[in-house]
Amino acid sequence: MMKLRDLEFDFDISCPEDLERYLRCSEDMTQKAASAPPMPADVTSMDGLAAYKEWMTAYVKLLTDWIDGIFGDGACNKLLGPKTSLSAVLSLCDEIGEAAVQQGNAVGLQIRKYTPN
């Protein structure tokens, strides 16, 4: 189980199926990001702001789809609510990464416990 923001999800980075889903969703996100609009260099004009909104919308969708792909449909709404900002979803992605590292470290300790020197 992975605990994120007081919610528990049936996900364990040491479970082959869960790790496969994590890797597959990450690969899907990478492929979709290749066709996402580029981040505009200038956002000081109305056209620049419109381009920034398009870029931001695409990346929020990429990240929320990644989270829902890993933890199940609706997971992102449970974690962030229906109004999702880029900064909020990026913070959540950081939390997911930290939680996965913690799970991996816990398994590593168990492995070392039973591995001969």
Can you annotate each of these PLM segments?
Residues A51-A58, L80:
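Short acidic, glycine/proline-enriched loop segments that cap or flank alpha-helices
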Residues G74-N117:
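C-terminal charged interaction modules
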